[in-house]
Regions:
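Positively charged, polar, low-complexity stretches
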Residues: 12, 27, 50, 54-58
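N-terminal polybasic/positive-inside topogenic patches
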Residues: 38-40, 45-49
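Glycine/small-residue-rich interface belts in oligomeric ring/scaffold proteins
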Residues: 53-114
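A short linear-motif detector with a strong N-terminal bias
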Residues: 1-4, 49, 71-73
Length: 328
């Protein structure tokens, strides 16, 4: 089934439901581009045309194909039935601030018939198990960072050796040690650091990570787990701790897209082209472990593997190894 990320940022729009379709009525000038960029749907359709002759353009998308609806334009009107049916279809709803950065997310509540059973197992998971799982996650993240540095910079700058020193719960904070080596080398800038509000490539990283978080949150709910109950992240004001845990090894996919975007001379503005680059990375198909799969499928496999760990069917989380460049 086609997975679509619909980014409503370019023009005002009114949303409604008709015959299990999400209907988008855009209000735009004749020379404005469509609100749902071509990058948001890798199977172009009339709703993705680069220009519209009418001031009002109505398009529709099957609800079952909407993986996430991202709303950034201040004049997008969305009714309760739209949100309810989007949740019932398993989609995510993301709202952005005036800088087009995601600030809120809504996920389906009842996405799995075994939810009560699995939530009980999740809530009662012992601390030693959580620490062991966090060790696996940190190792996979650092290894993915090492692979990206090797591909782009010709060497991993010691990250592969660092993987072997990660202990249960990462008490030595090897994740942070790796980050201090990783970011300056990745962006070829000794002064580059991850900062949420920095007016540089961090803006693109923040947007890409937020969309990735929504994809993982959707997978978590689909597996019958709750995104709030994390393995390592536990801030009381964070409703998506588990999503933040599980996306860690997938972050380098976003990093790679941002580095390529900046290296191509497209700048660091979070504009339409920047978003298109990031949405393409999320919607791409990746080659891993001898198979070609979407990021949605990979995240779903990771979430389901956590269920199997909690139910004592295995002791390993599933993450893809050696992810290759996206395939069209």
């Amino acid at each position: 089934m086609t997975e679509r990320l619909i980014d409503l940022a370019e023009s005002a729009a009114y949303l409604r439901i008709r015959n299990r379709q999400l209907v988008i009525e855009r209000h735009q000038s004749r020379d404005r581009e469509g609100a749902s960029s071509p990058a948001a749907d890798r199977h172009p359709s009339p709703d993705d045309s680069d220009s519209q002759e009418d001031a009002r353009a109505e398009t529709s998308v099957p609800l079952a194909e909407v993986a996430a609806l991202i709303v950034a334009h201040p004049q997008v009107n969305c009714s309760q039935p739209v949100l309810a049916e989007l949740m019932q279809s398993g989609g995510a709803f993301i709202v952005c601030d005036s800088r087009s950065l995601p600030v809120g997310m809504m996920l389906p509540l009842n996405a799995n018939v075994l939810q009560s059973q699995r939530l009980a197992a999740q809530a009662s998971a012992p601390l030693p198990l959580k620490k062991q799982l966090w060790k696996q996650i940190v190792r996979r993240k650092i290894l993915a960072q090492a692979e990206l540095l090797t591909e782009l910079r010709g060497g991993d700058h010691g990250l592969s050796d660092l993987v072997r020193t990660v202990r249960s719960g990462d008490p030595d904070n090897r994740e942070a040690v790796a980050a201090r080596r990783y970011w300056p080398v990745l962006f070829d800038d000794p002064n580059f650091h991850r900062r949420f509000d920095a007016p540089d490539a961090n803006r693109l990283l923040n947007y890409g990570y937020a969309v990735l978080r929504a994809v993982m949150g959707r997978a978590i709910c689909g597996a019958g787990l709750h995104p709030t109950l994390g393995l390592h992240h536990h801030h009381r004001e964070n409703p998506f701790c588990l999503a933040d845990d599980l996306i860690e090894p997938y972050r380098p996919l976003i990093d790679a897209a941002v580095v390529e975007h900046v290296a191509a001379g497209r700048g660091t503005e979070l504009d339409r082209i920047g978003k298109q680059t990031l949405l393409e990375a999320v919607l791409a198909r990746y080659s891993a472990d001898g198979e070609v799969r979407t990021l949605f499928d990979l995240c779903a496999r990771t979430a389901v593997s956590l269920v199997k760990v909690l139910e004592k069917q295995t002791d390993r989380l599933v993450y893809p190894k050696n992810l290759s460049e996206p395939r069209p």
